[in-house]
Design a protein with these regions (language model features):
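Helix-breaking motifs and short loop linkers at transmembrane-helix boundaries and internal kinks
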Residues: 52, 84, 105-111, 122, ...
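Residue-level signature of mid-helix packing/kink "hotspots" within the transmembrane helices
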Residues: 38, 66-74, 124, 158-159
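Glycine-rich segments within core transmembrane alpha-helices of 12-TM secondary carriers
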Residues: 144-169, 173, 190-191
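Symmetry-related core transmembrane helices of the 12-TM Major Facilitator Superfamily/SLC fold
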Residues: 181-200
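Extracytoplasmic
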Residues: 21-55, 71, 161-165
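Cytoplasmic helix-loop-helix junction between adjacent transmembrane helices
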Residues: 115-152
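Conserved MFS/SLC helix-loop-helix module at the cytosolic interface between two early adjacent transmembrane helices
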Residues: 71-110
């Protein structure tokens, strides 16, 4: 009986530490991912007229994003299995951050369409990658609760993303850039930074984690 209580306490302590160390960072990553996915809608308020983008061309670009996302989902998951979830999550974030920054310099319908397709390809596999990473650390009986907490990033991004995007659009003229360009660059840069931090902050295995004691690692 004492052993059962002891094991239960160790498990609770381990889950608590993992939750505080891993979950907030992954929520932040997904928060940035969701903002980078939808911020083009805010940018369009001034971007479409500036680069001569029609509503049809804009909608076509949105379609290309999801087409690329679907096409590259399986290859991305296969690469993730070979390279590991942590490294692949970092790669995805750095790549989509770079594409997001480059989107600020599109000049017309063709470059816009290409940028949306590339962003979809870059982001493909992120959500499955995060889920796989979480399963490496949390027992199955905790996963429903953990994923529910992780998904808080979506309403959070909707709540913060709108006023943030409006604020950034107001920075028209900064460094000679249009407001929509400032918006896309400043909301894409965090993805690159977080991608690099993934390699440092997210542990690969329990063996090299200093913030778990030996009993918790076992």
């Amino acid at each position: 009986m004492k052993n059962d209580i002891s094991i239960s306490e160790v498990e609770k302590s381990t889950i608590r530490k993992l939750s505080f160390r891993i979950l907030p960072f992954l929520i932040l990553c997904y928060f940035i991912a969701y903002i980078d996915r939808v911020n083009i809608g805010f940018a369009a308020l001034t971007m479409n007229q500036e680069i001569g983008l029609t509503a049809t061309a804009f909608g076509f670009g949105a379609t290309l994003f999801f087409i690329a996302y679907v096409i590259f989902e399986i290859p991305s998951n296969m690469a993730m299995e070979k390279l590991g979830a942590r490294i692949w999550i970092a790669r995805i974030m750095i790549t989509w951050g770079i594409v997001g920054c480059c989107t600020a310099f599109i000049t017309g319908p063709i470059s816009y369409a290409i940028s949306r397709f590339l962003l979809g390809a870059a982001e493909a596999g992120f959500f499955p990658g995060v889920l796989l990473y979480l399963t490496l650390w949390f027992p199955k009986r905790y996963m429903a609760r953990i994923v529910a907490v992780f998904m808080v990033a979506i309403p959070l991004s909707n709540f913060i993303g709108s006023p943030l995007s409006a604020l950034l659009l107001g920075l028209h003229g900064l460094l000679g850039l249009s407001g929509w360009q400032v918006l896309l660059i400043l909301e894409a840069l965090p993805a690159i930074l977080l991608g690099v931090l993934c390699l440092v902050w997210l542990p690969n295995t329990a063996n090299n984690v200093k913030w778990l004691n030996q009993e918790e690692k076992d």
